Amino acid sequence: MSIGCKIVKDFQRPAPELVTRFKDMPVANIDDNMGRIAAVDAAIEPIGYKGQLLGTAFTVRVPQGDNLMFHAAMDLAKPGDVIVIDAGGFTDRAIFGELMATYCKARGIKGIVCDGAIRDRGGLAAMEDFHVYARSATPNGPYKNGPGEINVPVVIGGKLVRPGDIVVGDDDGVLFIDPAIAAELADATEA
């Protein structure tokens, strides 16, 4: 898939009450109620698991090994968002590390899910109240050439993710929930 240059600054976010319906629900239980095929590829793992990740997807698509649009995304995302980066599964260059994650945390962003590589694994694992899921780690830094896209549908670990999807992660993995089915899914998972 070719990557253009597009920035969608805002999108419809689900009501906070809908997102919090999934608080403390295990990803495995939610996945069971989504046909047992909703979780992303198991290669995308938590970096230093710290409890549940819960928020709203703020999507970014970047060229392999390039993080120019991630810089823009950090400033556009809102508190409660989870930045979801489609890096095409490329693992030879990190998209971000501890410094960028620290900036995101200071802005109220809940975490980052990256279908690509990160760096500073130890620093990311030690961060409190900030969650990172990634395909791998490498010390190699990124390019900053662009282009890239913000708040467009992306693919993470083989699953479609749209801006505004509900993000739920735990030590088993991460999945994304379409807000249109979220209330019914929460009811089924609570039962």
Q: Where in this protein do the model-derived segments appear?
A:
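Feature captures the catalytic cores and cofactor-binding loops of soluble hydro-lyases/lyases
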Residues: 2-163, 176-191
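C-terminal binding/interaction regions
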Residues: 167
